[in-house]
Each structure stands twice: as C-alpha cells, then as structure tokens.
C-alpha cells in the first residue's frame, strides 16, 4: 500500500481519532492484564505454574514516560522470578536489546537505596522475557530471540558463549498456534477472538466502524463481555490507535521493501 493511499484513508476524522488515542498509555493487552487474577492465570498457562493467590504477584511495571520507547506491557515479580510480558503485532528483531535496556532500569529501581559497592550480594529476581505475538506476518509457534544475534563479532568467553546474553521467548497467539496455552487462559483466547473480529470487519469498513461493530458483536457473543462493557469507550479509542499503528508499521516495511532498503 502506498503512502498516498494511507494518507487518503486517514483523513481529518481519523487524525482526530488518532490524536485522542495517543493520550492513552495502555494497550488492550495491558488493560486486560492489569487484573492480577487474569495476569496470574496467564503466568500459570505460559510457565506451567500452579500459583493460586493473585496477591502474591507484585506488579512492578515502570510507568515513566521517558521509557515508553522501551516499555513493556507488564512486569511483575512472583516468587523469585521477574517476568516481562510484551504483546507485539509486528515482528521486532531488536526485542532482546529493548528488554535489556528495560530490565537494566528495572534492576536499578529494585536495587535503589542499597549499596552496590558492598561486599554483601544484592539478590535480584531471575528475569524472564516473553513476547505474545499476534501480527499478520507469518511466524513460528515459538521463537527464541537472542541478544547475541546482534553482536558484530564473537568476542566472547573461552567456551564460545557470549559474555552477555539475553533470551526472549516469542509465543505466536494467532489462530492455530499455541492453542493449549489459550485453552488454559480463556482471556487470552477471547482477546484473540476480539482482534480477529476487528480485522475481519476492517477489510470492508472504515476502522472506527469496524472496531465499534466488533465490540458490539463480542459483547453479544460473551467474548470479553464484562471487560468490554466496563471499558467500552477506552477500548474503542485504544483499538483505533493500535490498528492504525499496525497499518502504519506494515506500510513502512512495504515501502522500504519497494525502495530496496
């Protein structure tokens, strides 16, 4: 799709909607999993855990606007682990680097007020990096991304392992992928039903109409019903922003490919 087509599609009304939506820091995914009960269910589903007390989960997501470019959707500590969850509708080869920058700030925050020059070891939770991918570009069911893939040389330890490594597990949650995960976490399954509903209507309708129609259909069918009834206006505005951003990202990639970049 050319830039001209995208601009024509946007229009003044779309620009106004986009401006409104940009005021929200949340994403639909983050809104859903701001509920500790739902977040614990997702954690148990993806990790194989069997935790039962949502209050044992401590949400530690960084909120500072300056870190929005490297943000993750939700970070939380449970037992001895720090989990960083991110939902992505586009493929990001730099996710390990983004997570490195983010977790460094997270560790700095967790260690605040403690003497890092002390002979006593400062204990830190073991980090886990999970990306939930639901974009249109074909991806495998599971993909491990490594920070070392970005290294220009192999200047590593004697055993051949990098001196600094970070692994991100990307889980494809599109229809037909990781169905067992979604079976164990009904909210994740219904989230993808909503996303697919918007995409289906978006093919034949203006984006706002597609989102509003999808919201009403999901409410009728009991898909995220309570959440959509409670957060309807915010979900509509946020969805417009998210799907506009998804279109923008795809357009930039297509134009780069056409230009031979």
Residues of each region from the PLM?
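Elongated, amphipathic alpha-helical interaction scaffolds
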Residues: 1-261
């Amino acid at each position: 799709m050319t830039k001209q087509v995208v601009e024509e599609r946007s229009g003044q009304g779309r620009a106004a909607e986009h401006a409104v939506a940009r005021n929200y820091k949340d994403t639909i995914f983050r809104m859903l999993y701001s509920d500790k009960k739902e977040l614990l269910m997702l954690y148990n589903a993806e990790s194989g855990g069997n935790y039962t007390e949502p209050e044992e989960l401590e949400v530690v997501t960084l909120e500072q606007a300056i870190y929005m470019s490297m943000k993750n959707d939700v970070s939380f500590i449970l037992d001895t682990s720090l989990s960083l969850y991110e939902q992505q509708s586009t493929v990001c080869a730099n996710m390990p680097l983004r997570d490195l920058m983010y977790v460094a700030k997270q560790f700095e925050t967790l260690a605040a007020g403690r003497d890092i020059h002390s002979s006593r070891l400062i204990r830190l939770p073991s980090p886990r990096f999970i990306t939930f991918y639901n974009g249109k570009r074909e991806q495998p069911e599971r993909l491990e991304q490594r920070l070392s893939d970005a290294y220009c040389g192999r200047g590593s330890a004697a055993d051949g392992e990098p001196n600094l490594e970070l692994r991100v597990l990307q889980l494809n949650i599109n229809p037909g992928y990781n169905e067992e995960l979604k079976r164990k976490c009904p909210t994740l399954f219904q989230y993808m039903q909503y996303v697919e509903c918007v995409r289906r209507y978006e093919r034949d309708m203006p984006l706002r109409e597609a989102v509003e129609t999808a919201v009403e259909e999901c409410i009728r069918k009991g898909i995220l019903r309570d959440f959509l009834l409670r957060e309807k206006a915010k979900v509509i505005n946020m969805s417009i922003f998210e799907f506009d951003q998804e279109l923008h990202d795809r357009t930039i990639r297509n134009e780069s490919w056409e230009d031979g970049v």
